[in-house]
């Protein structure tokens, strides 16, 4: 994806991207630049890799395996194509963050001080094809303060889903 300080990829979004699909693309651009050690990546004259995000990357495997779950996502890296899609716009963000985690990015607490991004210089991906479904419908922290930084941190860590009110929610979980 990145070599010699240049981006070797082109991001493809649907013609009318959802705000979350656009956010997923923006976050991918931002963190690929950070991984490469630059503030902004110039595009190479030739961009051989296509990164399809959201509805631009939807496929039948994702629809079949994750039809009922709004948090499932699909990552496929094959030849010169990377496909990142979710069963919802939020799940599309989960796909991007999962890919970034594979590259070493971590978000330990809200805000820039809580992120850890290795400087790789060169960013390469291994062939991959998988569907991820959360083990729990509800992945929340009730003590997490509300606010833009906390909300973004929660999204980056794939928190969300159904909220189970109260401390005794076992009956709703099973």
Which ranges hold each PLM region?
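Acidic, contiguous N-terminal accessory segments
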Residues: 1-74, 118-131
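Feature activates predominantly on carbohydrate-active enzymes
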Residues: 24-27, 31, 66-174
């Amino acid at each position: 994806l990145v070599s010699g300080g240049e981006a070797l990829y082109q991001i493809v979004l649907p013609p009318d991207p959802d705000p979350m699909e656009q956010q997923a693309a923006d976050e991918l651009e931002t963190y690929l630049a950070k991984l490469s050690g630059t503030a902004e990546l110039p595009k190479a004259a030739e961009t051989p890799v296509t990164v399809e995000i959201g509805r631009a990357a939807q496929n039948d495997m994702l629809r079949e395996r994750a039809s009922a779950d709004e948090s499932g996502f699909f990552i496929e890296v094959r030849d010169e194509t990377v496909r990142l899609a979710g069963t919802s716009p939020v799940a599309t963000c989960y796909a991007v963050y999962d890919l970034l985690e594979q590259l070493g990015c971590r978000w330990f607490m809200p805000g820039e001080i809580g992120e850890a991004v290795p400087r790789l210089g060169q960013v390469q991906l291994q062939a991959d094809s998988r569907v991820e479904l959360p083990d729990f419908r509800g992945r929340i922290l009730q003590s997490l303060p509300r606010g833009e930084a906390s909300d973004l941190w929660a999204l980056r860590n794939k928190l969300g889903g159904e909220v189970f009110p109260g401390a005794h929610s076992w009956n709703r979980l099973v």
